[in-house]
Amino acid sequence: MSFRKVVRQSKFRHVFGQPVKNDQCYEDIRVSRVTWDSTFCAVNPKFLAVIVEASGGGAFMVLPLNKTGRIDKAYPTVCGHTGPVLDIDWCPHNDEVIASGSEDCTVMVWQIPENGLTSPLTEPVVVLEGHTKRVGIITWHPTARNVLLSAGCDNVVLIWNVGTAEELYRLDSLHPDLIYNVSWNHNGSLFCTACKDKSVRIIDPRRGTLVAEREKAHEGARPMRAIFLADGKVFTAGFSRMSERQLALWDPENFEEPMALQELDSSNGALLPFYDPDTSVVYVCGKGDSSIRYFEITDEPPYIHFLNTFTSKEPQRGMGSMPKRGLEVSKCEIARFYKLHERKCEPIVMTVPRKSDLFQDDLYPDTAGPDAALEAEDWVSGQDADPILISLREAYVPSKQRDLKVSRRNVLSDSKPAGYSRSGVSTATAITDIPSGNLAGSGEAGKLEEVMHGLRALRVLVKEQGERISRLEEHLGRMENGDT
């Protein structure tokens, strides 16, 4: 009997990570050294925020995404806290609003100017006071406007209406020990927590009740994290009794045994999982690691499918993840991370290689947009709503090569096209839009014909190479599946 090796088919098998060039990094940022298992970084389509070292209090830096290169030491910061900042989170419904939690026991919400900071920001829009110990966790409600959750080292979870500075719910009896992280579910009707007592809990915040609990989800003593997936399952990252790092997938309807359990390695850095509900891919970053592992979650055993690992030389001190609406879809970018080094932030782009330069519908289903589905009052009254979805097709920008291929302009015409301007010719259409008399400044038709002949030959060559690559990929697929 012969056994054939079956390779699981997945459009994400060949996802690869690539750091940007040095001039696209953010240099000379003094990343916070505070001892706390937070990401220290938050990013949205407009701004990058990084918790930084600050004397006499806590601060974080907010940079427009295009503010790359070396950051001046005098660059203004958000510096209203009197103790170190532990966590920050951008509002999903307003790209200029960010919340922060600090060792000074307060939560502050800030309005960032549209074009970024020109002077230090010391006055928050609102200060939320209710915790008696440091606040280490901040997370906005995914669909209800102005609803913010905070969790502190007093083992208390508070839910606020930021618009009125009102404390909506206080959950102070569900956690006997330090809360490691909090994650809302898809529509914000529930959230899950990972706690120092090794339990994962699913909580209904409006009822103040425990919906489900799994004790000793991971038996190790080091910090673990739990996140909700789009289908209601829970993904956890923690440590075994022998201090090996583990990943697990749970069904809250049956919390007795994990659906899947994978051991990674014996490193001691806390694992930070980032989940993309559109692709069902989980990216796992370890604090102090120099790698990002990524896994696809499916309904088929073994449920957690390893895809690949991005590896670099420098360890990461924190990590931020760009929302899907901030990605470059024309480059088949499915994720972008902002890796914190000791003194810089380095974007890392995750790309699915595709030959076609058309919009890739299968990679970019409709995704959560910036509009809130509910007001805070609606959510408090018991309403739930899924995120309002938007299409990323409008963000698609055809590549220069595609512009060239679809051009139908008569390049041999001596007349200038309507609206022609020498200074306004774009790179994408420069070859086809410039009249023949201006091509080399000489008016020689022979040179123009030579250029056009070269273009036609190049197109034929590209087509032949594409067909050859397709045949090789098909042959390789048959070999992997044992058909040859």
Swiss-Prot record:
Annotated coiled-coil segments of the chain: 447-481
Keywords: Actin-binding, Coiled coil, Cytoplasm, Cytoskeleton, Phosphoprotein, Repeat, WD repeat
GO annotation (BP), single: cellular response to platelet-derived growth factor stimulus
Subcellular localization(s) per the UniProt record: Cytoplasm, Cytoskeleton; Cytoplasm, Cytoskeleton, Stress fiber
Chain positions found as Phosphoserine: S2
InterPro entries membership: Coronin (IPR015505), DUF1899 (IPR015048), WD40/YVTN_repeat-like_dom_sf (IPR015943), WD40_repeat_CS (IPR019775), WD40_repeat_dom_sf (IPR036322), WD40_rpt (IPR001680)
Subcellular location, principal: cytoplasm
Gene Ontology CC terms, in alphabetical order: actin filament; cell leading edge; cell periphery; cytoplasm; cytosol; glutamatergic synapse; lamellipodium; perinuclear region of cytoplasm
WD repeats: 80-120, 130-170, 174-213, 217-260, 265-305
Domain of life (superkingdom): Eukaryota
GO-annotated molecular function: actin filament binding; Arp2/3 complex binding; cytoskeletal protein binding; identical protein binding; protein-containing complex binding
Xref: SMART domains: DUF1899, DUF1900, WD40
PTM section of the record: Phosphorylation on Ser-2 regulates the interaction with the Arp2/3 complex and cell motility in fibroblasts. Phosphorylation does not seem to affect subcellular location.
Family: Belongs to the WD repeat coronin family.
Quaternary structure note: Forms homooligomers, but does not form complexes with the other coronins. Interacts with Arp2/3 complex components, including ACTR2, ARPC1B and ARPC2. Binds actin.
Record's protein name: Coronin-1B
Lineage, uppermost ranks: Eukaryota, Metazoa, Chordata, Craniata, Vertebrata
